[in-house]
């Protein structure tokens, strides 16, 4: 599981770390310890060079993208999204409509795992009938 967090320019720097912690706790609670243990978090923070305007009350403050090699049922995803929104609201005062979370479920063969082409083919050869 790969988690990417991005925030708007005007957010304090520690927001990214706090959001990453919230996502990890929500993943553990909604999807189980294995999913939380096998996750990598990348926090982008804000990018001053892009010139993004300060956030307004009705704009997105935080965007979270979760890419998973596993498939989760609709109920688990709803629980995950709800937990992230609730924890962010309670702990960071981020309104539910100011945080967007997306999950992409893709098979493990779509992940490089740092392998070059030869290593990848060798890895896949063990899975062929």
What are the functions of these language-model segments?
Residues 1-129:
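Interaction-mediating elements
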